[in-house]
UniProtKB/Swiss-Prot annotation:
Entry keyword set: Glycogen biosynthesis, Glycosyltransferase, Transferase
Signal peptide: none
Name listed for the protein in its UniProt record: Glycogen synthase
Substrates-to-products reaction catalysed: [(1->4)-alpha-D-glucosyl](n) + ADP-alpha-D-glucose = [(1->4)-alpha-D-glucosyl](n+1) + ADP + H(+)
HAMAP family documented for this protein: Glycogen_synth
Organism expressing this protein natively: Deinococcus radiodurans (strain ATCC 13939 / DSM 20539 / JCM 16871 / CCUG 27074 / LMG 4051 / NBRC 15346 / NCIMB 9279 / VKM B-1422 / R1)
Stored InterPro entries: GS/SS, Starch_synth_cat_dom
Pfam families: Glyco_trans_1_4, Glyco_transf_5
Family note: Belongs to the glycosyltransferase 1 family. Bacterial/plant glycogen synthase subfamily.
Keyword Magnesium: no
Length: 444
């Protein structure tokens, strides 16, 4: 079975978040587990791409100059589609709908040029939605994964219709139209043979008005047709392994964390209070405003360490706290520092308003750091109550109550050790999800 993944980013070649992490792990595990699986990944050839693909082809695709490059790693063939639209710094820009329409038009003709004919095409998030539509119109078997429904790839349809290369009949509510806009997420949902989300709970949540982002009616229909399901993301357990992590003093059990905790205290000048940390985009979705609102009470019992960037108002608020002796804030993203935080913290805060799956809580538990999470999406599916601390309402008081429960547990070393040992023993490898996807493909 020839499987083709399409995504806007893939670790380690291009990455801005969890989507890149998934595409950096899932295809390699599928290639290892699937005896008959040939796995290829197609992604844009960004000017900032980390790596040097070997050029395979250069020509025209849908009337536009295009080129394809190749890298092979871990049994996976990585193809990179070059277009003029992607020859600028960074990954994402305000005109991304137009850019990924160009990608969506050119992808299949470029693959034709090098003889890539997949049995199953698996698109990821709205940037791949147009490719899924074109593939379905060709009669290919297709799957589409929603990693975050909030981002949909919308643009005025009157202006954008000509960017798509789709026939006119697709520009209605049963196709790609959404309140007068082109909606590339909706293209993926409507044209895929099967749609997955990245956790079972999120698959249920997005059929409701609270989480459906205006697409809940379509998602309810897909559920009734048996075309929507949730498959949990896994974790790259080689990349995130406290036993072999080069960025920390390695350890294999909760007692071994002491060196990492001491190092983090020294790095940020923290006192002996337990460390509550988060590594996150600073965004409304992540509930960082709840954490900031809770800081006056949190610092009575906790040191608080935050690594992240995003919303300027949230960054400014955290910067304003940075002189407090129990608060440390590092702006931006820094992977070696992230490793040190996951290892050196005692607890990890994720007060998300919604969380399709979440990887941070999986990493935290892998490192024996106990999550404090809101019961939503993948957080509800992955953090057992006997390991972490959960709360239901997206409010600062509810979050604080969960933090108090964690603080009380921390005062009982035996209980904390038991929870941390359980956390480190949980299996969130990609093997199970990879098998589920392969089984899904066979049923398309």
């Amino acid at each position: 079975m020839r499987v083709l993944h399409l995504a806007s980013e893939v670790f380690p070649f291009s990455r801005s978040g969890g989507l890149g992490d998934v595409l950096g792990a899932l295809p390699a595990v599928q290639a290892r587990l699937g005896e008959d699986a040939e796995v290829t990944v197609l992604s844009p050839w960004y000017a900032s791409l980390q790596g040097e693909p070997q050029e395979l082809w250069r020509g025209e695709a849908w009337g536009e100059q295009a080129w394809l490059g190749e890298l092979r790693q871990d049994g996976v063939r990585y193809l990179f589609l070059g277009l003029n639209e992607f020859q600028r710094p960074g990954l994402y820009h305000p005109d991304d709908v137009e850019r990924f329409c160009a990608f969506g038009r050119a992808a299949l003709p470029a693959l034709d040029a090098v003889g890539v004919t997949p049995d199953v095409l698996h698109g990821h998030d709205w940037q791949a939605g147009l490719v899924v539509a074109h593939a379905r119109l060709r009669g290919l078997r297709t799957a589409f994964s929603v990693h975050n429904l909030q981002y949909q790839g919308r643009w005025n349809l009157h202006e954008a219709a000509g960017w798509t290369g789709l026939p006119d009949w697709t520009f209605g509510p049963d196709g790609v139209e959404f309140f007068g806009d082109l909606n590339l997420m909706k293209a993926g949902l409507n044209f895929a043979g099967h749609v997955t989300t990245v956790s079972p709970t999120y698959a249920q949540e997005i059929t409701t008005p609270q989480y459906g982002e205006g697409l809940e009616g379509l998602l309810v229909r897909l559920t009734h047709e048996g075309r929507l399901s949730g498959i949990l993301n896994g974790l790259d357990q080689d990349r995130w392994n406290p036993r072999t992590d080069p960025d920390i003093a390695a350890y294999s059990d909760p007692a071994g964390k002491a060196g990492a905790v001491k190092a983090l205290r020294q790095e940020f000048g923290l006192d002996d209070a337990p460390i509550l940390a988060t590594v996150s985009r600073l965004a409304d979705q992540k509930g960082m405003d709840l954490l900031i609102t809770a800081l006056p009470e949190l610092v009575r019992d906790w040191n608080v360490v935050v690594l992240g960037g995003g919303d300027p108002l949230l960054e400014a608020a955290l910067t304003g706290w940075a002189n407090h002796p129990r608060v440390a804030f590092a702006s931006g993203m820094n992977e070696p520092l992230a490793h040190r935080i996951y290892a050196g913290a005692h607890a990890f805060a994720m007060p998300s308003r919604f969380e399709p799956c979440g990887l941070s809580q999986l990493i935290a538990m892998r490192y024996g750091t106990l999550p404090i999470v809101r019961e939503t999406g993948g957080l509800a599916d992955t953090v057992p109550p006997e390991v972490g601390f959960r709360f239901a309402d997206a409010t600062a008081p509810a979050f604080l109550q969960a933090c108090r429960e964690a603080q009380a547990a921390f005062q009982d070393p035996a209980q904390w050790q038991t929870r941390a040992t359980r956390a480190m023993s949980l299996d969130f490898s990609w093997d199970g999800p990879a098998r589920q996807y392969l089984e899904l493909y066979r049923g398309l």
